[in-house]
Amino acid sequence: MPGARPRTPASPAGSRTFTGIATSSSSIRSSVDHMAVLPVDLDSTPDDIASLLAVDAAVRAAVGLDHHAPATGALHWSVDEGMWMALLRPGPGRALLAGWHHEFSLTEGSGNAGEAGTDLVGDAPGWWRRGVEHARTHDACLGFLYGWDGSRWWRLDQPADDGFDPELFPVTRAALRDIVDELADDTLLDAPDPDAVEALLTAGSALTAVELGAVLHAPDGWPEVDLDAGARAAREFRSAVPA
């Protein structure tokens, strides 16, 4: 993966505020605590990300690399360096994007069982805690946690770098183009044709072995590429995370 330090996620103008009531035992009055969530500068919808993850899984399966099979309500992605990301669907119209960068996430420990770490949920809706639970289930650190409300992504307003960068994780077409190029290079394949890669990204979970073969070309037939395995891996994503 690229080694450049990620930018702190930019937050466009606008924020939402969730209000919690805290009652002091020494006073009859209640204090009102405001904790804002800020919009995340990410245009990709949950469906867009699910489609990109299907392509990533197809390429990895075709070249013989491990990938996470989709589960109902959750798509998990990780690489050997310790980076991971998950797309979760807690309910209709809702989604969570959770993950961790092994070098750049400074919100360390919030997903590990037994460690409090940085609070990434705060007073956001309770279903955001599904992201923390997912990290703990995988015994993984949690660096970032974003919630989708049906129209855009939101994050808790906290100062520490969470390690998320859309150029490093498979959440944009540009990022996945780079990932496909790197996977082809790492497995000694020819440099992928850019137009063929674009067609593959557009196809998403409906990609075919022929479309995959146009991207993963082996000189002289070596190393071998299992295009059918790649197409099967992509098809598994068609109904794994329903909208």
Give the predicted meaning of each segment.
Residues 99-107:
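Short, solvent-exposed aromatic-acidic interface loops
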Residues 27-82, 91-92, 107-243:
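N-terminal domain-onset segments
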Residues 5-30:
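Low-acidity, Ser/Thr- and Arg-rich intrinsically disordered low-complexity segments
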